[in-house]
Amino acid sequence: MAKNIQAIRGMNDYLPEETALWQRIEGILKQVLSGYGYSEIRLPIVEQTPLFKRAIGEVTDVVEKEMYTFDDRNGESLTLRPEGTAGCVRAGIEHGLLYNQEQRLWYVGPMFRYERPQKGRYRQFHQLGAEVFGLQGPDIDAELILLSARWWKALGISEHVKLELNSIGSLEARANYRDALVAFLEQHQEKLDEDCKRRMYSNPLRVLDSKNPEVQALLNDAPRLSEYLDADSKAHFEGLCELLAQAGIPYTINERLVRGLDYYNRTVFEWVTTSLGAQGTVCAGGRYDGLVEQLGGRATPAVGFAMGLERLVLLVQAVNPEFKAAATIDVYVISSGAGTQSAAMQLAERVRDAAPQLKLMTNYGGGNFKKQITRADKWGARVALILGENEVAAQQVVVKDLRSGEQETLAQSEVAVRLALMLG
C-alpha cells in the first residue's frame, strides 16, 4: 500500500475553521491600510536569486543559511522569496512607480525560510508588509507606527505589545561604529560563542542580537551606536521620538536593536510581545533609503515594515479569546418532501439576489428536519429557512431563529426583508 503523502515539515495546511479567523484579522488589517491611503501590490513568489543577495546582504543569516534556492531548466538561479521588501522595490523600479513619485504600498502572502520549525515560526509563513517610497522625514516613520498601533487596538492586543526603537544612522556612521565594535570584541574573544566569533568580522552588528546571556552581559560595556550617529540621523530620530510622544505612543529605546537585514538605515523598530512565552517580534521594520538605488533605481527615500501573520493570529487567540471568526453561515435553507428541493434552490437564489451580503447555504444532503437543523447548527447558522410541501404550495417559508428557537411563517416574498432585520 502506497504511503500517504503529507505536507512538508514547517509548511502547514490551514483548515476552514482556522482560515475564517485569519480572514477576519486580515480584513481589519486591510481596512486600516486603506484608511491610511495604502494600495495593494501583488508580487511573484519566485525572484532571481541576485535580488535577495544584493538587497538583504550576502553575509546575513537569511542569505547564507535560510533561502530556498534552485536552478531552473535554463540554469538561472531562482529563490522562493524570504521577505517582501526586495521584490516590492524591484517591481517599483521595473514599472516606473518610484521615479519622482510618492507611493504607499502593501502586500500579503507566503514567504519561505529554511528554519527550525517552532511555534509561530515556520518554513512557509505568511507576511503582510507596508512600504512607503519618496518621503524622507520622521513624520512618515511615525505614521507607520501609528498605523500599526491602530491595528493592535482593533484586534484587542494593545496591552500585550511594546514598541522598541533605535537609530542605526548612516552608512558612514555604521562603518565607524563597526570598527569600534570589532576592536572591542577582539579584546574579549574568549567570552564569545562560536556564532558570535563567526559574525565578528562578517557582520559584527548582528552580535548585538545574540541571545547568549554571557554575550549580552559583555555588551553592557561595549561602545554604543548612539555615540557614533551623524547629526542628521540624530535629528531624524529625535523628531520621530517627539512625534510619538505627542501621539501618546509609549516606546523604549533599545540600542541593541539593529534588525537582521543589511538594507536598513536610520530608524529601526520592533513591536514585541512576551505573551507567547519568550519575547517575540510581532511586527518590525525601518528605513532603507539606499535600497532603491542599490537595486538600480534612482536614489529614493523609503521606509516600511512587515508582520508575520502566524504569530499575530497566535497572539490574538492567546490574549483576546473573545475575538472570534465571523459566522461561517448566516442562513441555512432546509427542505423535506416532494418537490421541495428545487423550491429551496430557487428561494436561496432569490434571497442571494436581494441580500448578496448574506452567507447562505442550502442543504443538499437529504435527511429529516431534525438532522438538517443539526447540520445548520454545525455550520454556525443563525437562521434556518424551512420548506415543506405545505410551504411550497402556499409560497411560504418558516423562518427559525436558531439561537432563540423562535419561528414564524412568512410569504417567500417577505423573507429577505425579515432576514435583514434579524441579521442586521
Swiss-Prot record:
Enzyme class: ligase
PROSITE patterns: AA_TRNA_LIGASE_II
Keyword presence, NAD: no
Keywords: Aminoacyl-tRNA synthetase, ATP-binding, Cytoplasm, Ligase, Nucleotide-binding, Protein biosynthesis
GO biological process: histidyl-tRNA aminoacylation
GO molecular function: ATP binding; histidine-tRNA ligase activity
Catalysed reactions, as listed in the record: tRNA(His) + L-histidine + ATP = L-histidyl-tRNA(His) + AMP + diphosphate + H(+)
Protein name: Histidine--tRNA ligase
Pfam families associated with the record: HGTP_anticodon, tRNA-synt_His
Gene Ontology CC annotation, any one: cytoplasm
Organism annotation: Serratia proteamaculans (strain 568)
Keyword RNA-binding applies: no
InterPro entries: aa-tRNA-synth_II, aa-tRNA-synth_II/BPL/LPL, Anticodon-bd, Anticodon-bd_dom_sf, His-tRNA-ligase, HisRS-like_core, HisRS/HisZ, HisRS_anticodon
Cell compartments where the protein resides: Cytoplasm
Recorded superkingdom: Bacteria
Quaternary structure (record): Homodimer.
EC number: 6.1.1.21
Family note: Belongs to the class-II aminoacyl-tRNA synthetase family.
